[in-house]
Amino acid sequence: MAVDLRPETWTVSSNEALNLSLVDENGAVNFKPTFTYPIYGDSEQIFGYKNLQIFLAFDSITFKPFVNVKYDAKLNNEIEDVQKLLLDKLPEDDVIIKDEEAWIKTFTKEQETFALPEKDKLVEEYEIGDQEFVIYRVSLQDPAIKMLHKRMQIFTLLFIESASYIDENDSSWEIFIVFNKNSKKCIGYTTTYQFWKYLGAQSFDSSKADEQKCRAKISQFLIMPPYQGHGHGKRLYQAIVKQWMNDLSVVEITVEDPNESFDDLRDRCDFERVINKNSLADCPNELPINIDWITKKQAQLKLEKRQFMRILEMFLLYQKSPNYRLQLKKRIYEKNFEALMDMDESLKKDKLQTAFQSLTEDYNRILSKVAIRKRTFSDSQGESDKRLKA
C-alpha cells in the first residue's frame, strides 16, 4: 500500500497535540497550553506523526510529572523525537513515562510527607467561598521548594509569552506561592528578584551598605489554569506589594515584561490601593501638576514612573478633574515628541486626539472593574462618596 505523503497528514499543531492535566482524588482537570514554541519551535507545528497526542499530567499537590506520547504512525526514524523535546524541559530523572500506575503510586507516597512551608514564611491568608488559602514567601534555596518549582516551571513556558527558566542557584530569587490551606494544592506563584538601586552620589554612602536601597521586580506571575478567574491573582499581587511597601529597603516595585492581562490586574490593584488609602487626595489642581509633588508621591507609592502616571491619570478621570484632558495629552505629546514634530498642526492634533481617546477608553474599561470601598474624599477635591462597579 502506498504511503500518504501529503504534509497535512503528518502535520499537527503542537498546541493541539499537547494535553495538560492536573490530577487529584476526583479525577483530572484537562486544559490546553497557550504557547508551545519554547518546546516545539516558533511555528508551533510538529511534522512526521499521524494522529499525535502528547499527554503531560501532574499531581495537583506534589506536581510529580507524567508523560505519555501516542500516535498511529511515524513517517520515518529521522523525525524529531517529540518526547525528548518535552523531557528536556522537565526535571531530569523525575518524570514517569507511560506507566500510569507507577506514577500514581509514586505521587501518593510523596503526598504522605508533603508539607506546606514553615509558619514564619506565611505572609497572607484569605478565603474564597468556603475555601481557605495561604501565601508564603520562600527562597529557592529551600530543597522542597526548589523541587516543587523545578516541576512547575514548565507552566511558565506554556502560559507566559517569552518566559524562560530562571537561575535557581541565584540566591536573590524569591517565590511567593499560593496554596489551598487544607488540600495543599498549589494555586499559583510568582518569582521575584531584588536589584540594588543607585540613588545618586549624594544619597550613596559606602559606609552604610546595610541601608542600601533596592528595586523589587515581579518576574513570572502565574495562577494555574484550573484556578483562574476566582481572584487568586489579585490576592497574590496585593500580598507581594504589601510585603514590599513594608520593607524600607525597597524603593520601587517593577514588573518584568508584563502581558496585557497582568497589566490589567496591576492597574486595578494599584488604583484600588491609592484610592482606598486616599493617597492622592492632595493632588494639586494646577496644570501641569507640580513635578515635585509627582516625584514625592511616586516615591511614597513605590511605583515606577510610567505606572504612577497611569494611576494618576486614572485618578483624574475618576475624579472628573478638568485637568485630566490636558494632563494626559501633555504626557502623550512629550512621549511622542520626535514622531510628532515633523507633522503639520492638523495631523498632529488628530494623532493626539486619537491617542487620547484610545487611552481614555482603556482607563474607563479598567475603572469599570475596580472595587472601591465607600469613602468620602477631602473637600478640596470637591468629590464625595463615589463608587465604581466591582
From Swiss-Prot:
One of its GO terms (biological process) is DNA repair. Its main location: cytoplasm. Component of the HAT-B complex composed of at least HAT1 and HAT2. The HAT-B complex binds to histone H4 tail. Belongs to the HAT1 family. Residues 138-290 form the N-acetyltransferase domain. One of its GO terms (cellular component) is cytoplasm. Its EC number is 2.3.1.48. It catalyses: L-lysyl-[protein] + acetyl-CoA = N(6)-acetyl-L-lysyl-[protein] + CoA + H(+). One of its GO terms (molecular function) is histone binding. The lineage of its organism: Eukaryota, Fungi, Dikarya, Ascomycota, Saccharomycotina. Keywords: Acyltransferase, Chromatin regulator, Cytoplasm, DNA damage, DNA repair, Nucleus, Transferase. Gene3D superfamilies: 1.10.10.390, 3.40.630.30, Histone acetyl transferase 1 (HAT1), N-terminal domain (3.90.360.10). Catalytic component of the histone acetylase B (HAT-B) complex. Acetylates 'Lys-12' of histone H4 which is required for telomeric silencing. Has intrinsic substrate specificity that modifies lysine in recognition sequence GXGKXG. Involved in DNA double-strand break repair. The record marks 173 as: Interaction with histone H4 N-terminus. It holds the Pfam family HAT1_C_fung. The active site is at residue 256. Residues 42-44, 193-195 are annotated as: Interaction with histone H4 N-terminus. Acetyl-CoA binds at residues 221-223, 228-234. This is Histone acetyltransferase type B catalytic subunit.
